[in-house]
Amino acid sequence: MAKGEGNVIAQNKKARHDYTIVDTVEAGMVLTGTEIKSIRAGRINLKDGFAQIKQGEAWLVNVHIAPYDEGNIWNQEPTRTRKLLLRKKQIESLDNEVKGTGMTLVPLKVYIKDGFAKVLIGLAKGKHDYDKRESIKRREQDRDIKRTMKAINSR
């Protein structure tokens, strides 16, 4: 399967609005049993999350996975830091990009692929307010063009 394909559980739509996504990387997550059950139930929130690289390892920070209802004592803290599974070269290249150009790593979506939970991490650059307004104008213009083309073609 290509990057990002699978049973999509959660998406971070706010990230696409606030950031310009330059590149994406698929990563596995180190989870406990109750966390994967909670993710399969769709109880995950990516909105405030980000990824960072510390001492040659990638970590997913501030992603909220709700406690599993039947988890009892095996439930973990909902916003704990989770390790991301990437190859060493991928980690090094992401680290160089983040340190060199002032970009950040944001989770774009979580999905189940071949029975494993994967997260699509985006290498992103923050947008200014005027960039956001420009994106909205461009999107509205594209919609208007499509509407007029559809009206012309349906005659």
From Swiss-Prot:
<dbReference type="InterPro" id="IPR023620">
    <property type="entry name" value="SmpB"/>
</dbReference>
<keyword id="KW-0963">Cytoplasm</keyword>
<comment type="function">
    <text>Required for rescue of stalled ribosomes mediated by trans-translation. Binds to transfer-messenger RNA (tmRNA), required for stable association of tmRNA with ribosomes. tmRNA and SmpB together mimic tRNA shape, replacing the anticodon stem-loop with SmpB. tmRNA is encoded by the ssrA gene; the 2 termini fold to resemble tRNA(Ala) and it encodes a 'tag peptide', a short internal open reading frame. During trans-translation Ala-aminoacylated tmRNA acts like a tRNA, entering the A-site of stalled ribosomes, displacing the stalled mRNA.</text>
</comment>
<comment type="similarity">
    <text>Belongs to the SmpB family.</text>
</comment>
<dbReference type="Pfam" id="PF01668">
    <property type="entry name" value="SmpB"/>
</dbReference>
<dbReference type="GO" id="GO:0003723">
    <property type="term" value="F:RNA binding"/>
</dbReference>
<dbReference type="InterPro" id="IPR000037">
    <property type="entry name" value="SsrA-bd_prot"/>
</dbReference>
<dbReference type="GO" id="GO:0005829">
    <property type="term" value="C:cytosol"/>
</dbReference>
<keyword id="KW-0694">RNA-binding</keyword>
<protein>
    <recommendedName>
        <fullName>SsrA-binding protein</fullName>
    </recommendedName>
</protein>
<dbReference type="InterPro" id="IPR020081">
    <property type="entry name" value="SsrA-bd_prot_CS"/>
</dbReference>
<dbReference type="GO" id="GO:0070929">
    <property type="term" value="P:trans-translation"/>
</dbReference>
